Every structure is written in structure tokens, then in C-alpha cells.
Amino acid sequence: MIPTVKLNFITSNKNKLAEVKAILGNVVEIDSQAIEVPEIQGSIEEIAKEKARRAAEEIGGPVLTEDTALGFRALKGLPGAYIKHFLSALGHDGLNKMLDSFEDRSAEAVCTFAFCRGPGEEPILFQGRTEGIIVRPRGPLNFGWDPIFEHNGMTYAEMDKEEKNRVSHRYKALAKLKQWLEDGTLP
């Protein structure tokens, strides 16, 4: 058994924090800090790395950051890493309307965690992907785009927390991080 490691997860999203703690809780102790880190424009990987670098500089130590993308196949991957801004501007119905003139409503959810050991260090990425389709909102509306992303017949919002934490893009990324931690890579 590895000694308990503490990770400082940079987030102000209590739902993300709860999922991370539920999935990593037996391997690592999660502290959380809400700091504003300006996000660059770029690929999900570029955004995740830069966010981790900037957070490590601000904190002065090791950090874990997370970025999520939701890409619509019909729109060649848009809104992608900018889903948060699209959702804020358009809402669930607006995101659905973007696809109304297309037959293809398939989407890919991508979660990228970036771990940075500290200022000046290169972040390490852990990424998970889940395929699904975009549907009219179903289930509770309190966690981002969960009500419109359907995987295996249920939206993320319709799934109980345990089920979502077994199939989600976030779970898949965290499983890779968890394995890395269990392998003793983090001193």
C-alpha cells in the first residue's frame, strides 16, 4: 500500500470535486482550492497543460486541474473545449438546436486531468473519452451538460452517481491517474 498522497485539485465546481473524491478517495487525499486561472484557446490538451502550469505557479506547488470537452461529430468536434461557454450562452435547448439540421447527433465527451509537480515543471496528462449522443434534456439539470449527453440509453443526469462514475469520461481519465498513483510514480 502506498502512503497517502495529497493532491491539490484546482476547482470551484463542487460536483466535479465530489466525483474526483469518490473515484480517487482510497488512493489519494484530495484538497481543493478555487483559484481563477485564465484559460488559453487551443486544443483540450494545450488548455489543460497551460491551466496546470499557471495554477502551479500561483499555488507554488503541485496541482491537479481538469478540463472537459464535448465534441459534436456533425460539427467536426465543436464546441469541444469551449462547451462551458456554449452551454452558458445557449443552454441545453440551444445546444440541441445546433444539431437540429443534422442526422448525426453523436458526440464525444473528453476529460483531461493535468498534474503538475510545481512551478516550471511539465504537466502530465490523463485523458478519458466516452461516446454518446445529444438528446433533449432528461434528468436533473444541475450539472453542466449531463442532461443532454446520453450513453447506453441514459443521460449522465439520469444515472445514479455510482453508475456515472463507472462509465464517464471523467472516470476513465481518473482511472489512468489512479493507476499512475498506485504505481508509485508520485514521490
UniProtKB/Swiss-Prot annotation:
Homodimer. It is an enzyme of class 3 (hydrolase). It comes from the Eukaryota. Coiled coil: none annotated. Keywords: Cytoplasm, Hydrolase, Magnesium, Manganese, Metal-binding, Nucleotide metabolism, Nucleotide-binding, Nucleus. Belongs to the HAM1 NTPase family. Pyrophosphatase that hydrolyzes non-canonical purine nucleotides such as inosine triphosphate (ITP), deoxyinosine triphosphate (dITP) or xanthosine 5'-triphosphate (XTP) to their respective monophosphate derivatives. The enzyme does not distinguish between the deoxy- and ribose forms. Probably excludes non-canonical purines from RNA and DNA precursor pools, thus preventing their incorporation into RNA and DNA and avoiding chromosomal lesions. This is Inosine triphosphate pyrophosphatase. GO terms for cellular component: cytoplasm; nucleus. ITP binds at residues 11-16, 51, 67-68, 84, 143-146, 164, 169-170. It catalyses: ITP + H2O = IMP + diphosphate + H(+); dITP + H2O = dIMP + diphosphate + H(+); XTP + H2O = XMP + diphosphate + H(+). Mg(2+) binds at residue 39. It is found in: Cytoplasm; Nucleus. Its EC number is 3.6.1.66. One of its GO terms (molecular function) is XTP diphosphatase activity. Its cofactor is Mg(2+); Mn(2+).
